[in-house]
């Protein structure tokens, strides 16, 4: 499945004390899938450094099982910036892992420049 993301479908938000910018895409809208779908395969064509994503929502959320009890639209998070443990924010030049949960700051989770899954608010 190939996915071309329209610019109007992209919005930005901030997370972590250093106000790292993140790009959010609503997976449910973009893929026309129910928010309870457990697996998704996406090829983002938004940025030259983004690569094929193949992931399981359940696996990503396993440390936070309560998130699965409240189905909401899931959001794919593309993170060009990442926060260090001391809350400094820098560009994710080395393709460091990045992920996001609504109740946490950015932290390493997925071994790609890309990224993670969080609930849309």
Swiss-Prot record:
Location (main, coarse): mitochondrion
**Where does the record say this protein resides?**
Mitochondrion
Recorded protein name is Uncharacterized mitochondrial protein AtMg00840
* Keyword Mitochondrion attached: yes
Q: Which GO terms describe its cellular component?
A: mitochondrion
Task: Provide this UniProt record's keywords sorted from A to Z.
Answer: Mitochondrion
Q: Which organism is it from?
A: Arabidopsis thaliana
Note in the entry: A stretch of 270 kb of the mitochondrial genome is duplicated within the centromere of chromosome 2 resulting in the duplication of the gene. The expression of the duplicated gene (At2g07682) is not demonstrated.
């Amino acid at each position: 499945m190939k996915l071309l993301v329209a610019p109007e479908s992209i919005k930005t938000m901030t997370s972590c004390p250093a106000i790292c910018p993140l790009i959010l895409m609503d997976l449910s809208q973009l893929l026309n899938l129910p928010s309870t779908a457990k697996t998704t395969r996406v090829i983002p064509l938004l940025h030259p450094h983004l690569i094929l994503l193949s992931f399981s929502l359940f696996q990503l959320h396993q440390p936070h099982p309560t998130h699965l009890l409240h189905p909401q639209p899931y959001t794919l998070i593309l993170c060009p910036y990442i926060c260090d443990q001391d809350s400094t924010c820098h560009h994710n030049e080395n393709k460091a892992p990045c992920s996001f949960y609504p109740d946490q700051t950015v932290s390493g989770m997925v071994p790609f420049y890309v990224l993670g899954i969080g609930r849309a608010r």
